[in-house]
């Protein structure tokens, strides 16, 4: 067994105080997102973990890329027939989490996922490189396949079929908008006394703000 008990570090880069936060979590997320960009580092700042409850009753998490956020919520794109797509269809309650190690920050978002409009999905699909478009068509995500060669051969066929032609978005591929119900911001602090601020959505579209113990 590998003993990792000595793996630890002190978090000392910043703080999260009630006197310096907005009333709306999206505004704070926007601030943090761009501050993390300024920190630099090798990771993708828009990489997030999407957690769903599968048809087997077990939670499952995977990393996907956030493609847009606004007051309405958070948008990502995927194959609707994938394991995550089927899970969301059965149970739209999802959790998004961001861990920005270079800034010693984490954001956890609980919300409801629903498909974006076809126009939004079409517009994003049209912005993708042709190789990514064809990849979305050729890959029946989460299905068992005989080999990687199977995918590569099917991709070559599609490349020949669509050479010089527009590539349409497949109906089973598109976006999800996650409407946030609760957003927690975590800032690492010394001695494990981390700052945790939680926003919870109210029926009048306002947010309650609470500090949580670390």
From Swiss-Prot:
SUPFAM superfamilies reported in the protein's UniProt record: FMN-binding split barrel
GO biological process, one term: pyridoxine biosynthetic process
Pathway the protein takes part in: Cofactor metabolism; pyridoxal 5'-phosphate salvage; pyridoxal 5'-phosphate from pyridoxamine 5'-phosphate: step 1/1; Cofactor metabolism; pyridoxal 5'-phosphate salvage; pyridoxal 5'-phosphate from pyridoxine 5'-phosphate: step 1/1
Cofactor annotation remark: Binds 1 FMN per subunit.
A Pfam family reported for this protein in Swiss-Prot or TrEMBL: PNPOx_N
Source domain of life: Bacteria
InterPro entries: Pyridox_Oxase (IPR000659), Pyridox_Oxase_CS (IPR019740), Pyridox_Oxase_N (IPR011576), Pyridoxamine_oxidase_dimer_C (IPR019576), Split_barrel_FMN-bd (IPR012349)
Binding-site residues, substrate: 8-11, 67, 124, 128, 132, 192-194
Statement: the UniProt record of this protein carries the keyword Flavoprotein: yes
Keywords in alphabetical order: Flavoprotein, FMN, Oxidoreductase, Pyridoxine biosynthesis
Cofactor(s) demanded: FMN
Entry binding sites for FMN: 62-67, 77-78, 84, 106, 141-142, 186, 196
Example of a GO MF term: FMN binding
Protein's UniProt keywords contain Flavoprotein: yes
Broadest EC class assigned to this enzyme: oxidoreductase
Annotated catalysed reactions: pyridoxamine 5'-phosphate + O2 + H2O = pyridoxal 5'-phosphate + H2O2 + NH4(+); pyridoxine 5'-phosphate + O2 = pyridoxal 5'-phosphate + H2O2
E.C. number: 1.4.3.5
Listed NCBIfam families: pdxH, PRK05679.1
Family: Belongs to the pyridoxamine 5'-phosphate oxidase family.
Annotated function: Catalyzes the oxidation of either pyridoxine 5'-phosphate (PNP) or pyridoxamine 5'-phosphate (PMP) into pyridoxal 5'-phosphate (PLP).
Quaternary structure note: Homodimer.
Name of the protein: Pyridoxine/pyridoxamine 5'-phosphate oxidase
Organism: Flavobacterium johnsoniae (strain ATCC 17061 / DSM 2064 / JCM 8514 / BCRC 14874 / CCUG 350202 / NBRC 14942 / NCIMB 11054 / UW101)
